[in-house]
Amino acid sequence: AHLRYLNNFETLGEIPIMGFNPYKDTPMANHPPSPLEEQLKIMAVTRIMYPEIRITVPTPTIGPKNVEYSLNAGANNLATVIADNYPLEVKGVGSPVCGNYDDVVSVINKLGLTPQTI
């Protein structure tokens, strides 16, 4: 029902899909993270319902090792890909503690895809 609601927006260009990850020292610190399988189902259904839309998945949240599953499920935009030498005083999506660029690019290349560079 929530995905159908998005039909109300004529200029919708992107649907970000990000599962819940608990952060320590927050009210939901002990709540379990969103299961990967549920996130992948949402990506696949979103791709079927919106074949032309950009589906964005933040790599620190999904984890570099799960990028392949996300792309196969229908995601076509990977957000928050961080260079290995980036100064990691970063807070936010996934609160990464190390860069993930090489891991993410390796998965993209393994799938026979070419990463877009900025």
Question: What residues fall within each predicted segment?
Answer:
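Auxiliary Fe-S-binding modules of radical SAM enzymes
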Residues: 7-118
